[in-house]
C-alpha cells in the first residue's frame, strides 16, 4: 500500500500533517510506503489525482485509490485509516 501526501511548502496544515505522517513511518515499515508530492512542483500529478485542497492524502493499493482524506488529521485518525485499509476495508475515505 502507498500513502501519497499531496502537500505544499506554504501550507501550515501540510506541515502539521507531515509531522504526523513522519511519526507513523516506523510503525508501518514494510506495509505502507509513504511518499509526498509537492503540488507546486508537480501540478500535473495533483491534477491527475483531482487534488483541489492541501493537504490531501490518497491511499493506493496496487495502483488503485482505496481512500482519500482532505485536511490535516491527528495521528490516531491516520493510524486508524491505515489499519482499516491494510485489513481490506475499502470504505475508508473521510471528508
Sequence positions of predicted segments:
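Structural micro-motif
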Residues: 2, 49-58
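Typically the conserved alpha-helix immediately C-terminal to a functionally engaged Cys/Sec
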Residues: 13-28
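The canonical Cys-X-X-Cys-His
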Residues: 11-14, 57
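Non-catalytic, surface beta->alpha helical segment in thiol-disulfide oxidoreductase systems
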Residues: 58-94
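Structural microenvironment flanking redox-active thiols in thiol-disulfide oxidoreductases
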Residues: 37-46
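Short active-site neighborhood of thiol/selenol oxidoreductases, capturing the structured segment around
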Residues: 1-8
Amino acid at each position: 500500500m502507498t500513502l501519497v501526501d499531496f502537500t505544499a511548502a506554504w501550507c501550515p496544515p501540510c506541515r502539521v500533517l507531515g509531522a504526523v505522517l513522519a511519526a507513523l513511518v516506523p510503525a508501518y515499515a514494510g506495509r505502507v510506503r509513504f511518499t509526498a508530492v509537492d503540488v507546486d512542483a508537480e501540478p500535473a500529478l495533483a491534477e491527475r489525482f483531482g487534488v483541489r485542497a492541501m493537504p490531501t492524502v490518497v491511499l493506493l493499493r496496487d495502483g488503485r485509490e482505496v481512500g482519500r482524506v482532505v485536511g490535516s488529521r491527528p495521528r490516531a485518525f491516520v493510524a486508524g485509516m491505515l489499519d482499516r485499509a491494510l485489513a481490506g476495508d475499502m470504505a475508508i475515505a473521510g471528508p
